[in-house]
Swiss-Prot record:
This is Peripherin-2. It comes from Felis catus (Cat). PROSITE patterns: RDS_ROM1 (PS00930). Residues 341-346 are annotated as: Interaction with MREG. It is found in: Membrane; Cell projection, Cilium, Photoreceptor outer segment; Photoreceptor inner segment. InterPro entries: Peripherin/rom-1, Peripherin/rom-1_CS, Peripherin_LEL, Tetraspanin/Peripherin, Tetraspanin_EC2_sf. GO terms for cellular component: photoreceptor inner segment; photoreceptor outer segment; plasma membrane. Its main location: membrane.
Length: 346
């Protein structure tokens, strides 16, 4: 028995075709939106590629771009089919291909749903990518004279200013690396020598941070050196006083930014997916309603449209059986090819 059967007369078929035509062209616009979102995300990821590990994935933006293009193509074609469905002579050329086209639409909807899920799940992979990338970027902060790394200081400073953050997980990350170039160290100074000797790796470590970590909203002039030395500053206690630095780490700031982007894009993609599913269902009803017209010359006759020709369980069984038959036919062809090669070998 057909699933969700609906009766159609000529007036209802025309209204369905016209409604689907309009929905398809709206979906073309939605496809352009998805394409634009994917392009925007790709550009934003490229902007921060210097503070991301080399393994950062552009799968999600590339998928959004691809699905946006496919949405425009498929819905333009579906709009043409719906327009021609009003004319029996024009619809005849689409009739042999419509069932296959519906299968392609179902596959497209499945992939679109998976892409929407990927938008929500990208945060995990992005977190590890940012953690390693920011760590490397901070390590190369001092290499202003090294070709290929001379831009890293400017990149990190602009990042910390724009996102109001400091370090990877926090400002103390700067205490663990030498971020001042040897070029600007006075090696004749006893303080510099003592600091380098006190470190196992021979690095010049200080309890200070770059200027870009300073919070301009603080009423006190920025304290960026000797942050843990209370006696170095008047009326200062680093354990109890709120420092005039950005407290949040840049990894958390970037994750928050990209996370909000991905959630918004995932929500938009899900809405487009729901719209595409409704179009596919409408196309299925239009297809079965037109197929059910008993007398093509009598356009006023009633017909029945349905979503599935059989129940869900029966349709699933038929699908599994078709897969088994396909597998057996491939196996027979392979055995026939092996048998044909055996006499030649003899």
């Amino acid at each position: 028995m057909a699933l969700l059967k609906v009766k159609f007369d000529q007036k209802k078929r025309v209204k369905l075709a016209q409604g689907l035509w309009l929905m398809n062209w709206l979906s073309v616009l939605a496809g352009i939106v998805i394409f634009s979102l994917g392009l925007f995300l790709k550009i934003e990821l490229r902007k921060r590629s210097d503070v991301m590990n080399n393994s950062e994935s552009h799968f999600v933006p590339n998928s959004l771009i691809g699905m946006g293009v496919l949405s425009c193509v498929f819905n333009s074609l579906a709009g043409k089919i719906c327009y021609d469905a009003l004319d029996p002579s024009k619809y005849a050329k689409w009739k042999p291909w419509l069932k296959s086209y519906l299968v392609v639409c179902v596959l497209f909807n499945i992939v679109l749903f998976l892409v929407a899920l990927c938008c929500f799940l990208m945060r995990g992979s992005l977190e590890s990518t940012l953690a390693q990338g920011l760590k490397n970027g901070m390590k190369y902060y001092r290499d202003t004279d090294t070709p290929g790394r001379c831009f890293m200081k400017k990149t990190i400073d602009l990042l910390q200013i724009e996102f109001k953050c400091c370090g990877n997980n926090g400002f103390r990350d700067w205490f663990e690396i030498q971020w001042i170039s040897n070029r600007y160290l006075d090696f004749s100074s006893k303080e510099v020598k003592d600091r380098i000797k006190s470190n196992v790796d021979g690095r010049y470590l200080v309890d200070g941070v770059p200027f870009s970590c300073c919070n301009p909203n603080s009423p006190r002039p920025c304290i960026q050196y000797q942050l843990t030395n209370n006696s170095a500053h008047y009326s200062y206690d680093h354990q109890t006083e709120e420092l005039n630095l950005w407290v949040r780490g840049c990894r958390a700031a970037l994750l928050s930014y990209y996370g909000s982007l991905m959630n918004s894009m995932g929500a938009v993609t899900l809405l487009v997916w729901l719209f595409e599913v409704s179009i596919t269902i409408g196309l299925r009803y239009l297809h079965t309603a037109l197929e059910g017209v008993s007398n093509p010359e009598d356009l006023e006759c009633e017909s029945e449209g349905w979503l599935l020709e059989k129940s869900v369980s029966e349709t699933w069984k038929a699908f599994l059986e078709s897969l088994k038959k396909l597998g057996k036919s491939n196996q027979v062809e392979a055995e026939g090819a092996d048998a044909g090669q055996a006499p030649e070998a003899g």
